[in-house]
Amino acid sequence: MKEKLLVVCPGRGTYGATELGYLKRHHNGGGDNIARLDAYRAGFGQPTISELDGAEKYSPSLHMPGNNASLLIYACALADFAAIDRERFEVVAVTGNSMGWYLALSCAGVVGFDARLGTGLFDFC
């Protein structure tokens, strides 16, 4: 029998110097979702999530603005959710507040990735 799991998605947070390289360290770069976010951002001439997370040095002027920090937090949370061992855990509920509400919608599969692109969810890119 699988353990039941309630996932609480993070609301506002920070992507600070200690988080730099998080996707590479914990998720081998982040997978398909990160690649899709990278392509989306590149299309707008914005630094990609992979570039931001893989930077040699943390730069407050680069990493802290909302258009970068919000998506870094979002990308890390999506990668964390995707890494849950579904053989061991059954996700029975997903919740969040503030930005975590958007994350919860994504993690729960309420809207698909492509559908989110036209909703304003990524307008901060």
Indicate residue ranges for each PLM-predicted region:
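Stable alpha-helical structural segments in soluble proteins, enriched in small hydrophobic residues
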Residues: 79, 102-108
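Short capping loops/turns at secondary-structure boundaries
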Residues: 70, 96-97, 114-118
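Helix-rich "cap/lid" substructures immediately adjacent to catalytic or cofactor-binding pockets
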Residues: 2-95
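Short, flexible micro-motifs
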Residues: 13-16, 103, 112
